[in-house]
Swiss-Prot record:
Taxonomic placement: Viruses, Varidnaviria, Bamfordvirae, Nucleocytoviricota, Megaviricetes
InterPro entries: NUDIX_hydrolase-like_dom_sf, NUDIX_hydrolase_CS, NUDIX_hydrolase_dom
Family assignment from sequence similarity: Belongs to the Nudix hydrolase family.
Matching SUPFAM superfamilies: Nudix
Protein name, UniProt field: Putative hydrolase 080R
Keywords, comma-separated and alphabetical: Hydrolase, Magnesium, Manganese, Metal-binding
Binding site for Mg(2+): E151, E155, D204
Chain ranges for the short sequence motif Nudix box as given in the UniProt record: 136-157
A Pfam cross-reference name: NUDIX
Domain Nudix hydrolase: 50-241
Length: 241
């Protein structure tokens, strides 16, 4: 499977992966890699830009919930529409779409019969919603910390200050998403961070955007026996397709 991104210098600052867990469903495999870092490494990462990678926040609220966003559009819908316009086959991609998007594609192809959509199940095991962490790619050499703050504001309409955030200073997570529909691997770095807001406060201040809607919160409980890796795995089980 081809890598969507090359290995950047960021790995020079991270020690060897401490542990790796693999989750797999019908559309994806996700490798969760735990990296041990320190405050110096974290500052170095935050002050550099890596446009080939995606950087995301795993936000933990004051009432101990992890904040997720629902995508308004599935990942591959634009690609499906483009392929239909070109008369190209895209059945595998259609299987990844929201049901409303599948219905729209059926209407687009009803006369041309470009894609054998009748074979696409309406009751498969993929989630009704596609959840993401706030985050995205650096704009050129934009520092990672600036990227995280900008993306959070763009995806939630909520501005944040660094003083409102408490990043985990010893761990960062790599989420390598192997997308079976397109045969590519997408590399994401996830930074656990505690935020000085409750889930109710985020919900009240959130405004739907072009790409995101429906702020969703995963209760992580009050047990101190759960490791941070356990929490990451719990949330990824909800996010994986």
């Amino acid at each position: 499977m081809d890598n969507e991104t090359s290995t950047p210098d960021i790995f020079q600052w991270c020690v060897s992966p401490f542990s790796k867990i693999t989750l797999k469903r019908s559309m994806e495999q996700r490798d969760i890699v735990e990296f041990r870092i320190d405050a110096t490494i974290l500052r170095q990462i935050f002050h550099h830009g890596f446009p080939d990678l995606s950087f995301n926040l795993m936000v933990i609220t004051t009432d101990r919930k992890v904040f997720l966003l629902e995508r308004t559009e599935s990942f591959h819908y634009p690609r499906v529409v483009e392929r239909i316009k070109r008369g190209q086959e895209c059945t595998k991609l259609v299987e990844t779409l929201y049901q409303a998007e599948r219905d729209a594609v059926r209407r687009l192809t009803a006369e041309a019969d470009i894609v054998p959509l009748a074979a696409v199940k309406q009751d498969d095991d993929r989630p009704e919603s596609i959840y993401i962490f706030p985050g995205g790619h650096c704009n050129g050499n934009e520092p990672v910390l600036s990227t995280l703050l900008r993306e959070f504001r763009e995806e939630t309409t909520i501005p944040l200050k660094t003083t409102e955030l408490r990043f985990h200073a010893t761990k960062v997570y790599g989420i390598w998403i192997h997308d079976f529909a397109v045969g590519k691997t997408f590399k994401n770095f996830v930074f656990p961070v505690k935020i000085n807001l409750s889930s109710a406060a985020i919900r009240d201040r959130f405004r739907e955007t072009r790409h995101t809607r429906n702020p969703t919160f995963v209760d992580i409980g009050k047990s101190h026996r759960q490791s941070l890796l356990d929490l990451v795995i719990k949330v990824q089980k909800i996010m994986i397709l």
